[in-house]
Amino acid sequence: MANPWWTNQSGLAGMVDHSVSSGHHQNHHHQSLLTKGDLGIAMNQSQDNDQDEEDDPREGAVEVVNRRPRGRPPGSKNKPKAPIFVTRDSPNALRSHVLEISDGSDVADTIAHFSRRRQRGVCVLSGTGSVANVTLRQAAAPGGVVSLQGRFEILSLTGAFLPGPSPPGSTGLTVYLAGVQGQVVGGSVVGPLLAIGSVMVIAATFSNATYERLPMEEEEDGGGSRQIHGGGDSPPRIGSNLPDLSGMAGPGYNMPPHLIPNGAGQLGHEPYTWVHARPPY
């Protein structure tokens, strides 16, 4: 006998559909796997974001950057050079001197002897001290020469001395003196100039001298002047380069025969040759 329809419905209600339940279980398992995967990706992204935040400098933080120092590294270039020692003076150099002339000595004669002994020209720049018994040449004085007795203070002392042959007027001293009563006299020293106490003289010496006559002739403008270099290992002899001037005299200069060049009647560019001895150190 056939079952009524409600029997079938009740039977269906009590039955469990295994296919539906298994499908639901598979879907739940798949969703749980997706959830775990999403969670892992989210965790990885959060860790990456944390690392990025740690790498980025925060506000107020000091960023230290290792930079190369400017300039060359030490020892690469510009190394210290060995010092240069000059063991020989230049022949054209001037040498400064402070000369102390002792009491009772003739100032002019002492400086002239110093020039001949060292074989160097001496240029007197200044002097201080007291002198006595002075003989000066003055144009206004009777006979051109005046002798002064007593003590005088040196106001100015200048001049030059050459060790070798030289024209008149190129060597000597010019002095200005102050007397005890305040009078001032001066002129070229032509006699003794005796030192009272110590007389200090500031001078410069040189080893080369070239004689020039001015104004220069037109044909001499491009020739230049000759010069003798002293102080070498084999210095020239005195008078070796001076021409023979016999029978020629300059009326305006009253030059000795050995200083008039080549018998031409005019003075050219003539050097003075001195034997330069090495001075003691």
Curated annotation (Swiss-Prot):
Gene coding for it: AHL20
Other facts noted in the record for this chain: Overexpression of AHL20 results in a decreased expression of NHO1 and FRK1 and in an enhanced susceptibility to virulent strain DC3000.
Entry annotated with the keyword Methyltransferase: no
Key word Transcription present: yes
Any one GO molecular function term: minor groove of adenine-thymine-rich DNA binding
Entry GO CC: nucleus
Region feature Disordered, mapped onto this chain: 43-85, 216-247
PROSITE patterns found in the cross-reference section: PPC
CDD domains tied to this protein: DUF296 (cd11378)
Chief localization: nucleus
Compartment annotation: Nucleus
Entry domain remark: The PPC domain mediates interactions between AHL proteins.
Keywords: DNA-binding, Immunity, Innate immunity, Nucleus, Plant defense, Transcription, Transcription regulation
Protein function: Transcription factor that specifically binds AT-rich DNA sequences related to the nuclear matrix attachment regions (MARs). Negatively regulates plant innate immunity (PTI) to pathogens through the down-regulation of the PAMP-triggered NHO1 and FRK1 expression.
Residue spans binding DNA: 67-79
Protein name: AT-hook motif nuclear-localized protein 20
Organism: Arabidopsis thaliana
Domain PPC positions: 91-229
